[in-house]
Amino acid sequence: MNSKLSLFDIRTFLESCLLSVTNLSEDIRINNICTDTRSLVSGDLFLALRGESFDGHSFIPQALTAGAIAVVTDRPVEGLGETVAQFLVEDTLVAYQHIAAGWRQRFTIPIIGVTGSVGKTTTKELIAAVLSQFGNVHKTRANYNNEIGVPKTLLELSPDHDFAIVEMAMRGRGQIALLADIAKPTIGLITNVGTAHIGLLGSELAIAEAKCELLAHQPPESTAILNRDNALLMETAQRFWQGKTITYGLEGGDVHGTVDGENLILDGVSLPLPLAGVHNASNYLAAIALAQCLGLDWQQLQSGLTVELPKGRARRYQWGQDVVLLDETYNDGLESMLASLDLLANTPGKRRLAVLGAMKELGDYGPTFHQRVGAKVKALGLDGLFLLANDPNTDAIAAGANGVETQSFSDGPSLVAALKTTLQPGDRLLFKASNSVGLGAVVSQLLAENPTSV
């Protein structure tokens, strides 16, 4: 937020949820909206959020000491003095969202909302890499993709930005709708619909409907970009959206690409794939479709594109002597797991070993989906399976992979020790599980052996 807001602006943004305001000096401008006193500097406004294990109101004294000139609270606070403005609201999280929505409305740049069951973060990073060839890009950082993170992302917008990419995650109905109402994207992109969070929503159709809330709540003059290869997404989207639509896909669509080795072929033009795997070719095609939507010269990408993904997402490391680690430990779902196993099977090497853990939030589908993962390991003819067996569902992976040499470990250190004694030159390993399983710590311990990214 390089262009400062006045306290009058804050009052305007909060009009629908404001109970009272004291010590308001309309000509005073704030530097930033801050929810964490550890990063607050003099001239900031402190907004006291509440969480399951914290209450931001407890940190108001620290905020004042650090130089906060205004606070947003959901209860009256004594001892602020006569120079600190207090905005009393019904709910500070709602207030945070209203301020972010008001700030976003000051920008006329393309705002791209990205969601999907699988690949939304990778697609966001590919879009950012593409758009950075044409201007200054602002994007969702880390996992700031929920009801708190999206406002934070929007409040970081500045007049220097030419494009903004807002990732939107959900764990239930109504959440994407809320995020779209706040961000008001000019383009809404849905990568796919799968089974992630099926234990919470109950069915793939319910997941599709939740994802398509993006379409229902983006402005009617905006554009939808949809993965034509995902039949359920396309069927569901028709019920939510009748506006301008661009489809993309490896099987068909307005932007139709094909994979030829390590290249994506589009309209006779060969583009080097920034990331390995057919699933990532589809994600890259989504970014190209977006570039076309914006009228950008995507053919400039023939010289190649570099994408730096967050830790645990499509990262490759060289370990020891000619051993490659494929790190996919940040998060997981059935479709993502199966695609990553395909990637491992198609990675040149001597032995291909899967190091897997459980997939979370599958509910009653858990045993069946995990058995499908094991069956995939067996069908691909992988050379070995290592399981971090800290979840009962990993037994179903082992059962599905019956016939594949399988080793199970109850904790990360014992798994690391076994891998160090097992690995041979030419081995290719895939590490894949839901983030909460802790398989990322196994990769981190192995990386202590001084690896290099590849």
From Swiss-Prot:
InterPro entries to which the protein is assigned, alphabetical: Mur-like_cat_sf, Mur_ligase_C, Mur_ligase_C_dom_sf, Mur_ligase_cen, Mur_ligase_N, MurCDEF_CellWall_CoF430Synth, MurE/MurF_N, UDP-N-AcMur_synth
Main subcellular location: cytoplasm
Residues that span the membrane, as ranges: none
Keywords: ATP-binding, Cell cycle, Cell division, Cell shape, Cell wall biogenesis/degradation, Cytoplasm, Ligase, Nucleotide-binding, Peptidoglycan synthesis
Organism: Synechocystis sp. (strain ATCC 27184 / PCC 6803 / Kazusa)
Positions with a binding annotation for ATP: G116, S117, V118, G119, K120, T121, T122
Subcellular location(s) of the protein: Cytoplasm
GO CC annotation, single: cytoplasm
Reaction equations catalysed: D-alanyl-D-alanine + UDP-N-acetyl-alpha-D-muramoyl-L-alanyl-gamma-D-glutamyl-meso-2,6-diaminopimelate + ATP = UDP-N-acetyl-alpha-D-muramoyl-L-alanyl-gamma-D-glutamyl-meso-2,6-diaminopimeloyl-D-alanyl-D-alanine + ADP + phosphate + H(+)
Keyword ATP-binding recorded: yes
UniProt xrefs under SUPFAM superfamilies: MurD-like peptide ligases, catalytic domain, MurD-like peptide ligases, peptide-binding domain, MurE/MurF N-terminal domain
A GO MF term: UDP-N-acetylmuramoyl-tripeptide-D-alanyl-D-alanine ligase activity
Pathway of action: Cell wall biogenesis; peptidoglycan biosynthesis
UniProt name for this protein: UDP-N-acetylmuramoyl-tripeptide--D-alanyl-D-alanine ligase
Family listed: Belongs to the MurCDEF family. MurF subfamily.
Biological-process GO terms, alphabetical: cell division; cell wall organization; peptidoglycan biosynthetic process; regulation of cell shape
Function, in words: Involved in cell wall formation. Catalyzes the final step in the synthesis of UDP-N-acetylmuramoyl-pentapeptide, the precursor of murein.
Classification lineage: Bacteria, Bacillati, Cyanobacteriota, Cyanophyceae, Synechococcales
Top class in the EC scheme: ligase
EC number, UniProt record: 6.3.2.10
NCBIfam families (UniProt xref): murF (TIGR01143)
